[in-house]
Curated annotation (Swiss-Prot):
NCBIfam families, alphabetized: PRK13261.2-4
Chain spans, region Disordered: 128-182
Keywords associated with the record: Chaperone, Cytoplasm, Nickel, Nickel insertion
GO biological process, any: protein folding
Main location: cytoplasm
Bias type Basic and acidic residues, positions: 146-162
Cited InterPro entries: UreE, UreE_C_dom, UreE_N, UreE_N_sf
Species, as recorded: Cereibacter sphaeroides (strain ATCC 17023 / DSM 158 / JCM 6121 / CCUG 31486 / LMG 2827 / NBRC 12203 / NCIMB 8253 / ATH 2.4.1.) (Rhodobacter sphaeroides)
Name used for this protein in its record: Urease accessory protein UreE
Any one GO cellular component localisation term in the record: cytoplasm
Bridged cysteine pairs (disulfide): none
Xref: Pfam families: UreE_C, UreE_N
Amino acid sequence: MTELPQARRLLKQGEWTGPAAGCVRLGYDERFLRRKRLETEAGDGFLVDLAETTSLDEGCAFELADGRLVEVRAAEEEVVAVTGPILRAAWHIGNRHTPCQIEADRLVIRRDHVLEEMLRGLGLTLEPRTEPFRPEGGAYGHGRTLGHDHGPAQGHGHDHPHVHVHISHKPDEDETPDADPA
């Protein structure tokens, strides 16, 4: 059995130059990994063994132990292009922590019949497509937006602290308080 070349280092786009020895096309979910066997488009296998789980951006490259580079490209997948008043749509999509590719005249999300129905109800136009999906990275430099499902199948409790704030104000001069504090 032949041992696979290992990739223990990831170079971001702009950190490497020259032609890559190969290319691997991965869907959005597949571009979130730590350790996995992959194959280039030419069929050459290699083992990714990164120090931690990493979100791979299109254009980055795995550096193999022998110095060769394998470029990462986004694979085509089923998405829906959203057009119309996209500013409002962007708010609703973001409020649901849904990965979203933001372009000047459209938003692109993965297929989700519930979200699609809501967006149609807001007057947006939806066009199912098959194309590479390159959503924005997560907030605070994490590189990935992870959904926050409130369903019971998540295997964890849901005891987030909830804060309720009650604001009171001093009565205006023309208001009379309900009770005399004295």
